[in-house]
Design a protein with these regions (language model features):
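Ligand-binding pockets and gating/stacking loops
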Residues: 1-367
Length: 367
């Protein structure tokens, strides 16, 4: 693992964002052959098809937001079921959402809600594995640790499909996971499944970035002086050999073939350093996204996609208020969770649109 702190689809003329949403949504429900990896593989092998979507940003709401408090308020249900929030109209006639996501309400013509996604598990751990891999965990209704025989996450599958091309041009990774809870230990002292490559092997893990982009000292890569020293060596493996006592814990890198070359390219690539440098963004734009882990994560996701990364997952930060709201549900939603999500998600859509990238970028919001 590299870790740094019923209508027929159009063919010849390309695939629209809504068609991608429809087909990609089926893959997220676990239907074989219709997921994002298959679509990307088709993009690479079927030259007669020229899909418009070139990248995907996954917004993963850690803790599982309740649909009756967000997108589908169940206005006809009993009060005990529907909660205290009121629906508001969107800019699409007949579509309503919760009152605390007003920005997204005015962008409803830009996204498609899939309200039929469900799963039979009653624990967060295996449910996350299901949502992020498309496959039910072999131990349903439990809280298992991440294991080597888990099914891989979507980013890992994409890395595997592009075997030999795990890094995009200029040393950029193919798949990145931001604010990664995969690096964080749960209350039960284990690491959650669903975020890793599983049985594909650690070399296909996404690039995990656990440091938050809203921190003033955000620096997911080593200082440039350190990278230059690495660049001056003939290979990263030689650097490991010369500092074997200090880097003994990384000896397993040799088992991954060209994996150490990926690490070397990541550390020394100017393009990677530029892509992660959110300080290059204008202060007003950063403020539009919101100075939160999620908001700045969305901004960084846009920068990465703009630079050539194919799949970026922005995980909701679990050390802050997150979506598993068994206590003080309504206050947390209206004071923190929904406003921060509404701000970051809506700005991401508008920013991509302003840059002419929205039709080529699939955004998937789920939890």
């Amino acid at each position: 693992m590299i870790t740094i702190s019923g209508q027929p689809l159009r063919t010849c003329e390309g695939v629209t964002r809504r068609e991608w949403l429809r087909v990609g949504g089926l893959g997220w429900m676990g239907l074989p052959g219709l997921g994002l990896p298959a679509l990307w593989q088709g993009h690479a092998t079927a030259s007669e098809h020229k899909p418009r979507a070139k990248a995907c940003i996954v917004l993963f709401m850690f803790g599982a937001p309740a649909h009756q408090d967000t997108w589908d308020l169940k206005t006809n249900a009993p009060s005990a079921v529907r909660g205290e929030f009121q629906p508001i109209s969107t800019n699409v006639p007949g579509i309503q959402v919760g009152e605390h996501i007003p920005r997204l309400a005015q962008l409803a013509d830009r996204y498609l809600q899939i309200r039929s996604v469900t799963h039979p598990d009653n624990t967060h751990t295996v449910a996350m594995h299901y949502m992020l891999s498309g496959v039910r965990h072999r131990r349903p209704a439990t809280n298992p640790q991440n294991a080597a025989d888990d099914f891989p996450c979507f980013g890992a599958v994409l890395n595997h499909v592009r075997r030999g091309h795990a890094l995009a041009t200029d040393g950029l990774p193919t798949s990145v996971s931001l604010n990664a809870p995969a690096n964080q230990v749960s209350a039960n002292n284990h690491i959650f499944p669903g975020f890793f490559a599983g049985f594909l092997g650690q070399e296909f893990d996404p690039l995990f970035v656990s440091q938050h982009a809203n921190r003033p000292d955000f620096q997911p890569l080593p200082p440039i002086e350190s990278s230059q020293r690495l660049f001056d060596r003939r290979s990263l493996l030689a650097q490991f050999d010369q500092q074997s006592a200090h880097l003994q814990q990384l000896a397993s890198v040799r088992d991954f073939g060209g994996y150490h070359e990926q690490a070397f390219q990541l550390l020394t690539s100017p393009a990677v350093r530029r892509a992660f440098d959110v300080t290059q963004e204008p202060a007003p734009l950063r403020a539009r996204y919101g100075q939160t882990p999620f908001g700045q994560g969305c901004l960084l996701a846009r920068r990465l996609v703009e630079s050539g990364v194919s799949l970026v997952t922005v995980n909701w930060e679990r050390d802050d208020a997150y979506w598993d709201t068994h206590a003080d549900n309504f206050n947390l939603h209206k004071q923190k969770l929904l406003p921060n999500m509404d701000q970051g998600f809506s700005t991401l859509q508008l920013d991509l649109e302003e840059r002419g990238m929205l039709d080529e970028t699939l955004i998937v919001w789920l939890g």
